[in-house]
Amino acid sequence: MKMFNTLDFVEVAAGHFQAKQQFGQYQLSVVLLPGKTTYEIALFDDDMFVQLPGIHPDYYNEYSDDVIPRLLPVDVDLIMMKLYMMWAYA
């Protein structure tokens, strides 16, 4: 199973790093922004932002942000495990 330590971060702009990982139909994007020590993630389905229950903290609110900020590597690991389980057992 892919975990945070297996992500391949690429510098997409000065000091801006991004890694992508596919889980079935969903693509996870993990970003480290310049000057930050925590990560943010977003999920995509066919290049469109998606929100998933159990991953997005405010999923049931009328409006919640597609991007989940201020994540530690262990938080990203937990999200990756959930995505893997959704994909592997679908």
Where are these regions (language model features)?
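Mixed-charge, Lys/Arg-enriched low-complexity segments
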Residues: M1-M3, V10, F44-A90
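Conserved small-residue motifs centered on glycine
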Residues: I41
